[in-house]
């Protein structure tokens, strides 16, 4: 451990009462946020077990760390534990949750456990509708490069670390703050970042945008009076809220009045170059290994946080230049040689119209000569309904669109808010002819017919489409399957 990293005691030393807790159980342990907290706790020395409905890369990693993993939920699995951790995705009638309450076992929400981890640390909490995972990852990478040895909990795989969570030995904890269920109000960080604010997860906020705005202001007011709010002034709602924030504020963005400002933006392929201007400091000439203006904004947030903490410019420059990306955030899967020619496959998690638009813009800037083919999987019927016209507009911007069924995420279908309806509306708009694909088998038949030499193929969405991108890579984008089918014909 670096001599720059202040040795920090474990949770049970920071909070002596936590010594009473020996065995922690996670219901829904395979989620990225849940799995990250579980990984930190098992490395703190706690006995951990947990359940989920299916195996995943997260559950496999936790099992390797000694966590007992159950596939499926059963009341008997919680009988000998001291505390049960649940996410808001877990229904009230879950048998393990019901059993825990009957046995009078304390039940805490995921965000409450994260808040306990943050309570006696220097917390950096990253909130916002878009860009949380990338921004949190960039901050963690800068602090790591500066030998601050942070603990981090991220909603995606940090490629350089091979994990989405790590227990450091310093006082720093860098984590995503989840506004989807307003649970970020449990957190009491030292630094809060707000990347942007848009209408999403509106069921939580009773369809009231003003309530969403007020909740973000409340989140920032959880800062101590000596803390700092780092906010993106380019975002119109964030700019509107600044007069309501009663804490010290550092702004960032491309705007002329930003405290940390980007100039001279240029994207070449996957990376971006830009200049950073900060009041009273030398300009920074930077390159970040991420595409798109939106990722320059994410980088500015990390730079602002690091500058506040007096991290050396050299560490910032090196961390951004060497950044290896995050799983499913414009992740380059590979370049494939097929019967049609060379085709690049990229996988992206974005599932809100603004996120999809940013991804399309980054692809156009980085590879302007390539035709953009998107396989899109809508995520949740409610989001499709609430943002329907925005989806129609954004998805019409690609050259070729294949549409999968909606990934329900536990929701019941909503009439008029499904993939077939989206396809009809996009077709009427007249910019692109969408193709509805009912199954993976159909996709592997259709895709080789559509692809052309030089295409950039983008798999886009937050559901099971991430697994699809891997299977496409394994089948050479469906061309291997097509050859097999021809031989068997």
From Swiss-Prot:
Q: Which Pfam families match?
A: Mur_ligase, Mur_ligase_C, Mur_ligase_M
Q: In which pathway does it act?
A: Cell wall biogenesis; peptidoglycan biosynthesis
Biological processes per GO annotation: cell division; cell wall organization; peptidoglycan biosynthetic process; regulation of cell shape
Positions contributing to ATP binding: 128-134
One GO cellular component term = cytoplasm
In which family does this protein belong, per the annotation? Belongs to the MurCDEF family.
- Name of the molecule in the record: UDP-N-acetylmuramate--L-alanine ligase
The encoding gene is: murC
């Amino acid at each position: 451990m670096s001599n720059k990293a202040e040795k920090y005691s474990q949770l049970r030393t920071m909070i002596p009462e936590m010594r009473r807790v020996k065995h922690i159980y996670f219901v829904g342990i395979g989620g990225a946020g849940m799995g990250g907290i579980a990984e930190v706790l098992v490395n703190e020395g706690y006995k951990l077990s947990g359940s989920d409905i299916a195996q995943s890369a997260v559950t496999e990693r936790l099992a390797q760390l000694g966590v007992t993993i159950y596939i499926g939920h059963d009341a008997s699995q919680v009988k000998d534990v001291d505390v049960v951790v649940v996410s808001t995705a877990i229904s009230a009638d879950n048998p393990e949750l019901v059993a825990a309450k009957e046995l009078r076992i304390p039940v805490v929400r995921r965000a409450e456990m994260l808040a306990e981890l943050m309570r006696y640390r220097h917390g950096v909490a990253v909130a916002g509708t878009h860009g949380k995972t990338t921004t949190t990852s960039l901050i963690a990478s800068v602090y790591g490069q500066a030998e601050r040895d942070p603990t981090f909990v991220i909603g995606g795989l940090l490629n350089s670390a091979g994990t989405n969570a790590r227990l450091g030995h310093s006082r720093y904890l860098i984590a995503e703050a989840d506004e989807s269920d307003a649970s970020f109000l449990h957190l009491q960080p030292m630094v809060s970042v707000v990347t942007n604010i848009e209408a999403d997860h509106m069921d939580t906020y009773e369809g009231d945008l003003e309530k969403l705005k007020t909740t973000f202001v409340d989140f920032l007011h959880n800062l101590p009076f000596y803390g700092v709010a780092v906010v993106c002034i380019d975002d119109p709602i964030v700019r509107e809220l600044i007069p309501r924030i009663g804490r010290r504020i550092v702004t960032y963005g491309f705007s002329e009045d930003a405290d940390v400002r980007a100039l001279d933006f240029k994207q070449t392929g996957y990376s971006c170059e830009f200049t950073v201007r900060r009041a009273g400091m030398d300009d920074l000439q930077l390159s970040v290994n991420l595409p798109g203006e939106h990722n320059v904004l994410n980088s500015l947030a990390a730079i602002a946080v690091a500058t506040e903490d007096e991290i050396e410019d050299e560490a910032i420059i090196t961390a951004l230049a060497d950044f290896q990306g995050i799983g499913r955030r414009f992740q380059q899967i590979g370049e494939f040689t097929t019967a049609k020619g060379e085709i690049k496959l990229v996988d992206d998690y974005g599932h809100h119209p603004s996120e999809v638009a940013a991804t399309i813009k980054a692809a156009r800037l980085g590879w302007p000569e390539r035709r953009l083919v998107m396989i899109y999987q809508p995520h949740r019927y409610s989001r499709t309904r609430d943002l329907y016209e925005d989806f129609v507009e954004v998805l019409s911007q690609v050259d070729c669109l294949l549409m999968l069924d909606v990934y329900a995420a536990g929701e019941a279908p909503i009439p008029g808010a499904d993939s077939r309806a989206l396809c009809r509306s996009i077709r009427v708009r007249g910019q692109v002819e969408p193709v509805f694909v009912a199954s993976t088998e159909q996709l592997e038949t259709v895709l080789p017919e559509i692809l052309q030499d030089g295409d950039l193929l983008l798999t886009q969405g937050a559901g099971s489409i991430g697994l699809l991108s891997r299977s496409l890579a394994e089948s050479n984008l469906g061309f291997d399957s097509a050859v097999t089918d021809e031989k068997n014909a």
